[in-house]
């Protein structure tokens, strides 16, 4: 057989080449044009914020990694192809005129340069794109330092695991991929160019093909040997099924670890054997080496550890794993900030009795009992404080603390009155109006969380709504700032609500007469012109064209509203702004507003995390931070695994000009220290946090939820007890009937558990249940006070003390409470909603459960039917208190005098200039007086609306007397139904009582 002559490939015409070139340019523009536009816009945006160095550092790092990886991988693949081509046989026999390999060879030879360069280039570019996404790993390797703590197995500083090992793994992976791709390219090249022939019984392999392929296989084996070496270190942070802890256990240390060394030695021996085939010319040797390595990995790497696990460990697991569990306990506490320096454990009875005098003396707690639930009162904020259709409050409000006029620490429900572009209507949605007129919100609203305005005995009475302190631009153009702190600039251009709309940009700046809607007087509308430093100038045609392309909006080019003074505000979400200037941070899901130095700022908590801290428990953020609030708001954390977390950064975003400021909260964090080397001057030292800002820094919710989930296990000191799980705790489920997940932690002002001196403290708290039980096991409090910030106090509760679910069940099924609430909410006339169930340490070793109860007319969530506080229910030990106010409930529970230091309702008056309203068209009947609970004196009963007619000397008509007898008979029937436990009879008795009361009221 002779070599088939090469067929000539058809050539392209000049026109075809031109069309192909034009098409290629258009495709590149479509693919790369938006990327270049976004890059230029980001360059402008980072420069406006003063963080351009962050942007350029990222870009340069990504580009360097891209080119390094692309060149290395592309060069290795190119070398594999080039060697196959350069060492091809001079004469290649064909299998006949229809030999498919000959046809492919002809096609390749006709486009040899295109294929020989294009294929490695494409593979290199793809590898570069993937590689540049690991820029953070590279920067940590370059700038990481020591932790000052060594791992318990190898004695290596933890900085190696945090910063070095991930980089080595990355390099090893790319080397392995590059060599493997070179092997495939070389194999395919030799086959195509005739170095490998499969014709005949045994085929043929050229000497060059044998040397090159064997060399590449040997390199792969050497790389595998290096991988086995690094596998040893990764054992300390991996998890294996059946272990109750993270990290290397008995089997890992005594079987897997030696197996890795044995496999490494076998891989080296096999690599030497493979290389020897170059000289021995026996391909069976590399084949045997590959098979030996595979069998060894199965027998030594998997089989032997399995035997050790089943025969040696399983029968004596607690004792065998004891040493390694101790390692995990120590490491997890270090990694999650749960060491003795941060956590204080105290025994707490949980069921101690308390007198009225003791309760009253517990002023820091009783005067701050929270009755406003930030997850329920948002409709009331909307009803009374919205003002305009385009202003908006989120469904879940926030908690913060301020000092009142007397200097007492109080917690407040706070909200910023933001602009919501999605609520604009009709011509308000016009491009000019949406982006140049309706540009900002106006106002900071705060309500004392321990009181309401007036008493609402039923949801149709005036009262029971929050007391609003609204700091806004008033009708006279002046800033009205009644509290809780002085505010000079209430306008809000940056916030999560305004950023939730698509194309959230606003165009501001001097354009002659003011254009931006600001406020209204009695006669007209007043506009405003933004004077802040924030915003990217768009006065020239280049930037106007760029933003026109970015937002696909021609008005950037043709609108006369935009002039040389115009600026564009965009990327207005506070958390997104922080994540952009600090891409190495994971931010908390909750962003909250505060008045600091007479300005509204958004405070964002930032976390540094690792996922390979030796022996530390591996947690999934989205799982351990989920609670009923997050589920209701569909606001979940990243699905990210961590084994180390620090609240290393506190960030603020100015609500007016968007300025982002990063402060180092944990300056000892090695991860933060590394990033501060990467981005010098981007994070300010902790000493720059002003006292005014420090007073509003909260212990972050997500970190607390992670820590309470870990404390549920890692409060245990004894490894044998840990292994048995007998002393574990559980995060309780939210007992609220409308909840579907874990109970969230609550911010409260109560007595200081960190200092234990009776003073008021702002803290984040959570109850903990016994493992798979509903009894209380512990109470966790994290201090947010400047002096004791970050200190966790854990009150461990022995015995069988009611947990949140048992307490809520006892309260909600109490005869008096269920009777009255059933009457108020009967037939859907009113909707009853239970507020958050708070757990408060009270007296000398007791726990008080407090649940506010709200009601709104009808059974919908319409803003016009906002919920009012109608009752407060409490439980202490097994006793229940109930009343329209905290004072009434305390008196009912503990007796007269218990309410001496409690906060009562404020005087009923029209909120924010509005007249008192009676909502709804239905008038609910007055609730009948429920019978007293057995064993409780009626003296402490709160006054509730009662339809019982007057008694005494008043002379009644015959009809009135008959109606009175019907009421008494109905009450007797109700008592009988209660005693019988027949719910159907009980419902009929309630209806009969209601009819009798109505008849009595209508009778003259």
From Swiss-Prot:
Major site of localization recorded for this protein: membrane
Pfam families linked to this entry: UPF0182 (PF03699)
Biased composition (Low complexity): 896-940
Membrane topology of this protein: Multi-pass membrane protein
GO cellular component, one term: extracellular region
Family: Belongs to the UPF0182 family.
Record protein name field: UPF0182 protein Mflv_4654
Species the sequence originates in: Mycolicibacterium gilvum (strain PYR-GCK) (Mycobacterium gilvum (strain PYR-GCK))
